[in-house]
From Swiss-Prot:
Active site: D147 (proton donor/acceptor)
Annotated cofactor note: Mg(2+). Can also accept Mn(2+).
Residues annotated as binding ATP: K16, H207, I208, G209, N210, G211, D282, L283, R284, G330, V331, G332, E333, N334
Natural source organism: Staphylococcus haemolyticus (strain JCSC1435)
GO biological process: acetate metabolic process; acetyl-CoA biosynthetic process
Enzyme Commission no: 2.7.2.1
Subunit (UniProt): Homodimer.
PROSITE patterns registered for this protein in UniProt: ACETATE_KINASE_1, ACETATE_KINASE_2
Name listed for the protein in its UniProt record: Acetate kinase
Residues that bind substrate: R90
Coiled coil: none
GO cellular component, one term: cytoplasm
Subcellular location, record wording: Cytoplasm
Molecular functions per Gene Ontology: acetate kinase activity; ATP binding; magnesium ion binding
Amino acid sequence: MSSLVLAINAGSSSLKFQLIRMPEETLVTKGLIERIGIKDSIFTIEVNGEKIKDVKDIKDHEEAINIMLDSFKQHGIIDDINDIAGTGHRVVHGGELFPTSALVTDKVEEQIESLSELAPLHNPANLMGIRAFRKLLPNIPHVAVFDTSFHQSMPEQSYLYSLPYQYYKDYGIRKYGFHGTSHKYVSQRAAEIMNKPIEELRIISCHIGNGASIAAIDGGESIDTSMGFTPLAGVTMGTRSGNIDPALIPFIMQKTGQNAEEVLNVLNKESGLLGISGTSSDLRDLESDAEEGKERAQLALDVFASRIHKYIGSYATRMHGVDVIVFTAGVGENSSTVRAKVLEGLEFMGIYWDPKKNETIRGEEGFINYPHSPVKVIVIPTNEEVMIARDTVKFGEL
């Protein structure tokens, strides 16, 4: 039997939503509420392919949800709020408490709150959304879907840092990894496209957007990933540095007079592609600048690709080979230039990619390898919302 599931991503002043019909996985409507609690809030909803925008003051998440539900009825999307069978909520950090998604109870709410020190910008906002929905729709299941859960299958040798073991025991200092919902979705989809059991596949998933992470997925389980204790670690990103020598932090403090928080802000918001190029964090800008002969833009692209190269080589070694490489997220799905730079020189690994196919695929699903290539290369648009809806059906027992 069909049911309507809401996939929710609540920020501190925003609420993204998708209404999905399950198990068909068809999108009914989607939208975004911005500037919640700020003057001139913006409510946007897509109805029959047309975007409808309304500007009005929305004081909090509860009011935002009520406006969203009223809009569903007003546009004939639902007849009654009881048509909604369940809600699924993106939660950034589940720590070690949540190796899977979870049906939200008062105890689960408390546990999400207890993990807020691991994701101070996100978990409190995600929780605000959950609480508002539980209050307004008390008779349906609400499910929390964690960005970190998929990576909880990593073995100790992958997630432990070479620090005093007591730091892990006392403070939970370890690699958690992020983008898990995306990596899980594209790995499952890759197995479907290849018509092979996921248990037989070694997949390297490259989620490349403004934030980027690489994951080694062996038999459907994450065994390693590039992001760490926070999403700052790993490859070069739009404004994030990725991995650096930790001794640089006190050195930069000494040289610039900045405190630790200020240096951390530089690493998060002024580094990466923006830091190297000096002009932009957007790969599209850097690609056109590089074509015009701007050396720093080209350098930023080269550094970016080389860091991803390292992880592909490393993860192929960890899994004793690789069967498929997946590109996903904004850049991975749309930039043939970045894909080409990442794949260049990997023929020795059995990766033979077709430049023509690579050029033609943009924002759609498809193979970009030659038919004879032992390792397949697939572009797969990610769909975290469908993954959230699937887990809402599963854990909400719909």
